[in-house]
């Protein structure tokens, strides 16, 4: 490639530049970090900017995906009426008030509990514990 040859370079999401080699060498000599865009090459199509899969579409279209879609789902769950499983026992209060344990207590009094299998260990423990209090 001779010094005056041109090359096409991709400089970002939107811009294709046509830069001559001489200008590029001058920029390097000056220590220029950012080159000015000399010629915008219109032969190439507009490449997508921002949201990669939506191209240069409207803002409304972009809101239909990604973070906004996730946020709408969260809000929908929060505002959704709760199902039967998540309701409290408010509807059952009347039936719960009628429940009693009288019949069960008449059949098996609390004093006649089943014999324990502690073999006197509880008595030993209480005898050891009482003086410490």
UniProtKB/Swiss-Prot annotation:
UniProt motif (Nuclear export signal) ranges: 89-102
Region called Disordered, residue ranges: 42-65, 103-133
Compositionally biased spans, kind Basic residues: 51-64
Entry keywords, A to Z: Host cytoplasm, Host nucleus, mRNA transport, RNA-binding, Transport
Start and end residues of each stretch annotated as RNA-binding (RRE): 13-27
Motif (Nuclear localization signal and RNA-binding (RRE)): 59-82
Cellular component per GO, a single term: host cell nucleolus
Gene Ontology MF terms: RNA binding
The keyword Cell membrane is assigned to this record: no
Cellular compartments annotated: Host nucleus, Host nucleolus; Host cytoplasm
Primary localization class, coarse: host cell
Gene Ontology biological process: mRNA transport
Quaternary structure and interacting proteins, as annotated: Homomultimer; when bound to the RRE. Multimeric assembly is essential for activity.
Role of this protein: Escorts unspliced or incompletely spliced viral pre-mRNAs (late transcripts) out of the nucleus of infected cells. These pre-mRNAs carry a recognition sequence called Rev responsive element (RRE) located in the env gene, that is not present in fully spliced viral mRNAs (early transcripts). This function is essential since most viral proteins are translated from unspliced or partially spliced pre-mRNAs which cannot exit the nucleus by the pathway used by fully processed cellular mRNAs.
Domain topic, free-text comment: The RNA-binding motif binds to the RRE present in incompletely spliced viral pre-mRNAs. This region also contains the NLS which mediates nuclear localization. These overlapping functions prevent Rev bound to RRE from undesirable return to the nucleus. When Rev binds the RRE, the NLS becomes masked while the NES remains accessible.
Name of this chain's protein: Protein Rev
The species this protein was found in: Caprine arthritis encephalitis virus (CAEV)
Underlying gene: rev
